[in-house]
Amino acid sequence: MKPFTKKIVLESGREFYGYGFGANREATGEIVFNTSMVGYQEILSDPSYTDQMVVMTYPLIGNYGITDEDYETKYPTIGGMIVREYNDLPSNFRYTKTLGEVCEEYGIPCVWGIDTRMLTRIIRDEGTQRVIVVDASMPQEEALRRLKEAPVRRDMVERVSCRKRWFSRTANHRFDVVAVDCGIKHNIIRKLNEKGLSLIHI
């Protein structure tokens, strides 16, 4: 078995070893889990996961790659992704990049090879807590010190809201609606457009 390259360390001191993909950097965030069987690209680009480390309980992630049309926002702001098995050879005629390539492009560190079912049970039983992604060789005490000293971001809206006013118009126009964009997903925009609502995003 090849040596581990990354590990995640929880506030409680628990450690999980695995292998890195995506951005090769240290990162901290609140750890949460998602039980979806498909839709990892939508999760990756969901603004409600900004700066959070998302544990995917479904065991295989990355097998259909990333497509340009399926983002929920212009760019992902997720803190990181933790998966059981990562597939770097997607099979999908629509895909344009691998999950790892996109995460590297946007500075998102990811770890695979983790027992995500056990990790999910810990989150369920102990509640959410902060976590740090570091090199596997880092001592636990040093990782916990860095986690404790890492700043906690408060203003998530600033990162995910629009910078200037923009419009999303629909052909079957019935009403104009002002959307206060605090991190609106593209699917919400599409559904409102389908109902005949043209949106002014502010």
Language-model-detected regions and their locations in the chain:
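Conserved small/polar residues in nucleotide/adenosyl-binding loops
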Residues: 200-202
